[in-house]
Amino acid sequence: MKSLQALFGGTFDPVHYGHLNPVETLANLIGLTRVTIIPNNVPPHRPQPEANSVQRKHMLELAIADKPLFTLDERELKRNAPSYTAQTLKEWRQEQGPDVPLAFIIGQDSLLTFPTWYEYETILDNAHLIVCRRPGYPLEMAQPQYQQWLEDHLTHNQEDLHLQPAGKIYLAETPWFNISATIIRERLQNGESCEDLLPEPVLTYINQQGLYR
């Protein structure tokens, strides 16, 4: 049986413990040996990042240097076009072949807006979705047809993620950390401490570069 590959996308502006810690817990829960982080270049659903792509890449490298679970994929950073998950997953599927189990990790907030994503209906053709639960967010989709879509693909058996190449949605019971990149940027702008929110090498780099001031 081929091992489950997992991808984790985002802006990471900057990367912080709210990104890394839930995914590390998830890896232990469902048996992931490698998670590939894919930073966006031009995110289609949010404003352009404050740190440029080179700076965000370097912060990620610093954050995962002592974490063998994680590896970095730069393909979206090398595009000048918007970073569409559907496109990236199609590329991965073509590279890995039809039989390798592949999953894309998202937060519960992203699940609720998932039907607005570019070619969202093709994503489950190429990968599973693993959703990190977040308190305060409902499990119901906004419209009945999307709720039906969720229920049609939902599984409560994590083994399905390993045995099938794509097509399932799994809601993972991961810890939630009240940390966001927005909070970190605001604290830095106000001269407040962020030592408990992100890895020390990342904070050192932010200060050296004068980011988010």
Swiss-Prot record:
Q: A GO term (biological process) for this protein? A: NAD biosynthetic process
Catalytic reaction equation(s): nicotinate beta-D-ribonucleotide + ATP + H(+) = deamido-NAD(+) + diphosphate
Q: Does the keyword Chloroplast apply?
A: no
Q: Does the keyword Kinase apply?
A: no
Q: Name one GO molecular function term.
A: nicotinate-nucleotide adenylyltransferase activity
Q: What is its EC number?
A: 2.7.7.18
- Pfam families assigned: CTP_transf_like
- Sections of the chain in a coiled coil: none
Pathway this chain belongs to: Cofactor biosynthesis; NAD(+) biosynthesis; deamido-NAD(+) from nicotinate D-ribonucleotide: step 1/1
Function noted in UniProt: Catalyzes the reversible adenylation of nicotinate mononucleotide (NaMN) to nicotinic acid adenine dinucleotide (NaAD).
Q: How is this protein named in the record?
A: Probable nicotinate-nucleotide adenylyltransferase
Q: Which organism is it from?
A: Shigella boydii serotype 18 (strain CDC 3083-94 / BS512)
